């Protein structure tokens, strides 16, 4: 750490009134581009309008102006998020059975949407229990609200109104910080101050205030709810905050106030800041006292982290110094120059953030079921399945986005003249070795993982079960995974003597938590079937990475097209007269990567859905006998491709296929419609541009004949536009089909 003289006083870092507010200008389509603003000559214009509206790089090359537009757009995004949240809370207040659910969460399903009786649609209002008819929701909001300490629909109303006010505030902020007081470029590039505010402010104080809310509001209210007190009898949140005696009745140490904190007698607080591990047997969720403790600890960590960097005082780390000191024996100049890249290329910065956030989202998916954080979440199987699936898809998209913006950085922002022998340059210089090795790994994984299944299908078809890879014949036990499970199951005794259970029941042991006769969670056994499908996961992930990484590393040049950087991020081919150079742009790699991301995530959510129904979810009798939804058939059925088709896809599709005439029939219609959307995509993906141009010209001829031809000349989609429309419908259709299949199934049987 270097101690320097204090920086001069804070500089004025905003420009006043830089851009005038003009509705006339905004009303003109394409005002951001000289070409598009001229108006349409052909139908390609509308596509270009959509493609470039948010591509701020194409509007101007001034980094300050681009930064301001992005900053302003972020406020717009936040405004939409607040609006959406407000809508969720409003539905909870106006159209839901939240108060009824709160009184009996094990027998009443959550619903916050009641369909109006138009053309018989009221059939969709199923009986969710407690005399309420509506659509069962699987978003997890009810469980979240209970954990927050919300006990009435009035409180939801107030929160909804609050969110609306914040939405308006964000909208105003977006306008204000672009048109009235726009930050200068230096402000966007002051990374130490940004770290200070984001770490200590957002994450540190954010976690601290949430921990405070949990201790003072959520914990006492949930304690009353768990004891069966009528929500209307429970004191209101502000009463707990203002009246310490109320809390002291539940947690005696509250009467001592902050004295134990300042006298370092912290164990006094162990009543409400616990370290138990495992799940609360009443609700099937993590102990809320553990969660409060966790947020307090996280707050302390981030408050410290936010004060490690040098801002206006001459003390602390400088990020540039840290990066430039980061050299290894084989990495040349190391991270020299990375600071400049990340403060002048927002694509590079965004790429890193998307990769991190995407990975984190997938980690969230895996923790939501293995450590269910909210009360009564674990026994709401529809919500569990939805949360897992949702976070897996989102994570997949974010990671593909990371590759997309890394490639855009390479094409638009990378300057090879100033980058020599740093880490990125060295990676680019041995990119052939990286990609060819990765390709070999993909071929190996593909043939071996798939080969194990094909072997099993063949042996099964020939009636030779004793020669199959299975837990009852040739075993391929996942020994490393089992070792990790076992280590974690035994951990509390050694690493955390105060904890009564391990972090998650899934690790192993004998504990089982059931709530209201339904299994919340139990140890998840791993066997040959998991070993096989795990290698399919490895295969699909590596292929996705191969495609995306090749797109990034060869974004500027390749042996085939040495001057690729001049052609831009997306282009159909390297001009006429150069055959075999189509579909090589960085954009095309993102396009292809999306399909493999879809493959990868599909296998993961199928694995999860079947494994949980087979080995975890189910009912428990008074004698303690567990009956799983599909009776533990995963271990023997999923070891053949035929088993996946017959016992998972076909057997579990019966609910969605037979949903007509029931309250689940909307899922049947979506299942059909989404298949159609998916099939529609193939028309764009399997067809050439010339075919459509010929067809269009015949149609234009007919219009001319009838004198109804439009002034704007119709054009076939370009190759890139066609592929964009194709992949969009492919993913939308595929995801919506899966959604309908999963939900109809799990709402019917769960």
Curated annotation (Swiss-Prot):
It is a multi-pass membrane protein. P700 is a chlorophyll a/chlorophyll a' dimer, A0 is one or more chlorophyll a, A1 is one or both phylloquinones and FX is a shared 4Fe-4S iron-sulfur center. Keywords: 4Fe-4S, Chlorophyll, Chloroplast, Chromophore, Electron transport, Iron, Iron-sulfur, Magnesium, Membrane, Metal-binding, Oxidoreductase, Photosynthesis, Photosystem I, Plastid, Thylakoid, Transmembrane, Transmembrane helix, Transport. Its EC number is 1.97.1.12. It holds the Pfam family PsaA_PsaB. Phylloquinone binds at residue 692. It catalyses: reduced [plastocyanin] + hnu + oxidized [2Fe-2S]-[ferredoxin] = oxidized [plastocyanin] + reduced [2Fe-2S]-[ferredoxin]. One of its GO terms (molecular function) is magnesium ion binding. GO terms for biological process: photosynthesis. The keyword Coiled coil does not apply. Chlorophyll a' binds at residue 675. SUPFAM superfamilies: Photosystem I subunits PsaA/PsaB (SSF81558). Chlorophyll a binds at residues 683, 691. GO terms for cellular component: chloroplast thylakoid membrane; photosystem I. It is found in: Plastid, Chloroplast thylakoid membrane. Belongs to the PsaA/PsaB family. NCBIfam families: psaA (TIGR01335). PANTHER family: OUTER MEMBRANE PROTEIN, OMPA-RELATED, PHOTOSYSTEM I P700 CHLOROPHYLL A APOPROTEIN A1-RELATED. HAMAP family: PSI_PsaA. PsaA and PsaB bind P700, the primary electron donor of photosystem I (PSI), as well as the electron acceptors A0, A1 and FX. PSI is a plastocyanin-ferredoxin oxidoreductase, converting photonic excitation into a charge separation, which transfers an electron from the donor P700 chlorophyll pair to the spectroscopically characterized acceptors A0, A1, FX, FA and FB in turn. Oxidized P700 is reduced on the lumenal side of the thylakoid membrane by plastocyanin. This is Photosystem I P700 chlorophyll a apoprotein A1. It comes from Citrus sinensis. The gene is psaA.
């Amino acid at each position: 750490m270097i101690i320097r003289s204090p920086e001069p006083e804070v500089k004025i870092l905003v420009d006043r009134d830089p851009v005038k507010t003009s509705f006339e200008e905004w009303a003109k389509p394409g005002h951001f581009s000289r070409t598009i603003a001229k108006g349409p000559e052909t139908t390609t214009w509308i596509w270009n309008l959509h493609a470039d509206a948010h591509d701020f790089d194409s509007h101007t090359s001034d980094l300050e102006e681009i930064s301001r537009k992005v900053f302003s757009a972020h406020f717009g995004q936040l405004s939409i998020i607040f609006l959406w949240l407000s809508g969720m809370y409003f539905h909870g207040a106006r159209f839901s059975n939240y108060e009824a659910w709160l009184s009996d969460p094990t027998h009443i399903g959550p619903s916050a949407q009641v369909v109006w009786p138009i053309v018989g649609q009221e059939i969709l209002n199923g009986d969710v229990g407690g005399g309420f008819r509506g659509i069962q929701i699987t978003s997890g909001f009810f469980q979240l609200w209970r954990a927050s300490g919300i006990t009435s629909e009035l409180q939801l109303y107030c929160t909804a109104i609050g969110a609306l006010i914040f939405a308006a505030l964000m909208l105003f902020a977006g306008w204000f910080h672009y048109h009235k007081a726009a930050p200068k470029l230096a402000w966007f590039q002051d990374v130490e101050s940004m770290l200070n505010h984001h770490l200590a402010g957002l994450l540190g104080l954010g976690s601290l205030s949430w921990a405070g809310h949990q201790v003072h509001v959520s914990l006492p209210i949930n304690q009353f709810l768990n004891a069966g007190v009528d929500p209307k009898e429970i004191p209101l949140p502000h009463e707990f905050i203002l009246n310490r005696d109320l809390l002291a009745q539940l947690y005696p140490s509250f009467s001592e106030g902050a004295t134990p904190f300042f006298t370092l007698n912290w164990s006094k607080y162990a009543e409400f800041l616990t370290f138990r591990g495992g799940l609360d047997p009443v609700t099937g969720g993590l102990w809320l006292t553990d969660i409060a403790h966790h947020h307090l600890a996280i707050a302390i960590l981030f408050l410290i982290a936010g004060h490690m960097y040098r801002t206006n005082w001459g003390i602390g780390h400088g990020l540039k110094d840290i990066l430039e000191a980061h050299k290894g024996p084989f990495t040349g100049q190391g991270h020299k120059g990375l600071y400049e890249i990340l403060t002048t290329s927002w694509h590079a910065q965004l790429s890193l953030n998307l990769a991190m956030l995407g990975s984190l989202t997938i980690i969230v998916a895996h923790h939501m079921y293995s450590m269910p954080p909210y009360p009564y979440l674990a026994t709401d199987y529809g919500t569990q399945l939805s949360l897992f699936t949702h976070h897996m898809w989102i994570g997949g998209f974010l990671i593909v986005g990371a590759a997309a913006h890394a490639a855009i950085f390479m094409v638009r922002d990378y300057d090879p003249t100033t980058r020599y022998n740093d880490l990125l340059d060295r990676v680019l210089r041995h990119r052939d070795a990286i990609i060819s090795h990765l390709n070999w790994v993909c071929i190996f994984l593909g043939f071996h993982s798939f080969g194990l299944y094909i072997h099993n299908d063949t042996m099964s078809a020939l009636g030779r079960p004793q020669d199959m890879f299975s837990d009852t014949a040739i075993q391929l036990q996942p020994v490393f995974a089992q070792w990790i499970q076992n280590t974690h199951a035994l951990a509390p005794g050694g690493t955390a003597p105060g904890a009564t259970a391990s972090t998650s029941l899934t690790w192993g042991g004998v504990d089982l938590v059931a709530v209201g006769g339904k299994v919340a969670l139990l140890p998840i056994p791993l066997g040959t079937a998991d070993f096989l499908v795990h290698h399919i996961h490895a295969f699909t992930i590596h292929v996705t990475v191969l495609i995306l990484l090749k797109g990034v590393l060869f974004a500027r040049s390749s042996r085939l097209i040495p001057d690729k950087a001049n052609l831009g991020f997306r282009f159909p081919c390297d001009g006429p007269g150069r055959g075999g150079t189509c579909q090589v742009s960085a954009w095309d790699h993102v396009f292809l990567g999306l399909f493999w991301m879809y493959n990868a995530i599909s296998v993961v959510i199928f694995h999860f859905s079947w494994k949980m129904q087979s080995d975890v979810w189910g009912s428990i009798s008074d004698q303690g006998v567990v009956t799983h939804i599909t009776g533990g058939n995963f271990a023997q059925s999923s070891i053949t491709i035929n088993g996946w088709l017959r016992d998972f896809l076909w057997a579990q599709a019966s609910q969605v296929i037979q949903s007509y005439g029931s309250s689940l029939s909307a899922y049947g219609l979506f299942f059909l419609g989404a298949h159609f959307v998916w099939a529609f995509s193939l028309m764009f993906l399997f067809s050439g541009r010339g075919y459509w141009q010929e067809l269009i010209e015949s149609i234009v001829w007919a219009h001319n004949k009838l004198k109804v031809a439009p002034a704007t000349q119709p054009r076939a989609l370009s190759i890139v536009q066609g592929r964009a429309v194709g992949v969009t419908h492919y993913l939308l259709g595929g995801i919506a089909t899966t959604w309908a299949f999963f939900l109809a199934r799990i709402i019917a049987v769960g």
